[in-house]
Regions:
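Short, Asp-centered acidic motifs that coordinate Mg2+ and/or phosphate
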Residues: 57, 98, 178
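Rossmann-fold dehydrogenase core element
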Residues: 137-154, 174-179
Length: 196
């Protein structure tokens, strides 16, 4: 992992990058959702509780899925007649400020790169990407765009992780030479899927 981080730092000089944005607080943040599967439910629930956010668009590769998703979640007036993320992001009438990318793992990089290239901030579901090369490309796109790329990686806030961190930092275990951990998820990593 250290080698990967060093490669990324060397190629991107990320530590010296400063991102500043001015946001007009007199209007709502206009947000779109790319990928309307099960993880998008968590995103829409959060957005619905934010008074300064307006959900304006959504798309999914499965025709009709985005419209059904927003209807099921009680959100009206959302434009969903897009066949792809590119079509949605190319619609300048939306005036998107940000998108949540809730696609399959293998489909994270392309929409993130395209959104950033269109000047749209990105909230990207974990995992960031599935390869180092994709990660580097997404980070280059962020740097070139001056927009914000945020990775939704919340396990660090999990009470179990916090407890482990506290124990390790306390020194109670002495000097740690090796740790092995594992995890899983119900659905696994869905592959292969077509490039988008």
């Amino acid at each position: 992992i250290t080698n990967m981080a060093e490669k990324m730092d060397a190629k991107l000089d990320y530590a010296n990058q400063k991102v500043e944005q001015v946001i007009d607080t007199n209007r709502k943040l206009r947000v779109g959702i790319i990928g309307c599967g099960w993880i998008a439910d968590a995103h829409i629930d959060s957005y619905k509780r934010m008074p300064d956010v307006e959900l304006v668009a959504g798309c999914d590769l499965i025709p009709g899925k985005a419209a059904a998703f927003f209807k099921r979640n009680g959100v009206e007036g959302v434009k969903t007649d897009y066949a792809s993320h590119k079509e949605m992001l190319d619609d300048e009438s939306l005036q998107l400020d940000a998108v949540s990318i809730c696609t399959y793992n293998r489909q994270h990089a392309a929409p993130a790169i395209y959104a950033l290239s269109k000047g749209v901030n990105v909230l990207l579901e974990k995992p960031f990407t599935v390869t180092l090369d994709e990660a580097l490309e997404v980070m280059k796109a962020e740097k070139a765009s001056g927009k914000v790329l945020s990775i939704g990686f919340q396990p660090r806030l999990d009470p179990n992780m916090q407890m482990i961190k506290k124990i390790v930092e306390s020194g109670e275990l002495g000097k740690i030479y090796y740790i092995q951990t594992g995890g899983g998820r119900r659905r696994g990593i869905p592959t292969p899927f077509p490039e988008v």
